A protein has these predicted regions:
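Residue-level recognition of specific faces of alpha-helices
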Residues: 16, 35-36, 67-70, 90-93
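Mid-chain, well-packed structural core segment of small domains
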Residues: 70-111
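Short acidic alpha-helix initiation/capping motifs at coil-to-helix transition points
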Residues: 11-16, 46-50, 97-104
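Acidic, glycine/proline-rich low-complexity segments that act as flexible tails and inter-domain linkers
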Residues: 1-36, 55-59
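Short, solvent-exposed positions on alpha-helices
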Residues: 31-35, 49, 66
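Iron-sulfur (Fe-S) cluster-binding segments and ferredoxin-like electron-carrier domains
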Residues: 14, 51-70
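Short, thiol/selenol-centered motifs that function as redox-active sites or metal-ligating centers
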Residues: 37, 41-54
Length: 112
């Protein structure tokens, strides 16, 4: 497994990502949910390095293997809360924003 982005070569981009992470860490979103979102975004992006890293973070916070294994199909799985579903929909929409825009209903659900 190889790291896709060399943080030292792309320090300007990484600083922006870290700043965003720092900002979000101060929000009302709890760490286990952040970890779940990071893992889902890594699935979408196809980053094996990130999936390995975030799966370890999830397991360390008590995430179950069952939820990890079906996260790719979270819409059909009964294991996620309403809050998690709203956050997952938002994360997917933002990650795939080049395919259109974040739908209003996704934005409204995540605001709640």
């Amino acid at each position: 497994m190889e790291q896709r982005i060399n943080a030292y070569e792309k320090s300007h981009a990484m600083k922006s990502l870290y700043a965003l992470g720092t900002y979000l860490a101060k929000s009302s979103i709890e760490q286990p949910l952040f970890n779940l979102l990071y893992f889902r975004v890594s699935q979408i992006n196809g980053c094996a390095y990130c999936l390995d890293m975030h799966s370890k973070d999830l397991r360390a916070t008590g995430e179950t293997e069952q939820r990890l294994h079906v996260l790719n199909a979270w819409r059909e799985a009964p294991f996620y809360t309403k809050r998690e579903r709203a956050a997952l929909a938002w994360a997917e929409a933002v990650t795939n924003v080049t395919e259109g825009h974040v739908p209003d209903e996704v934005y409204e659900a995540v605001r709640k």
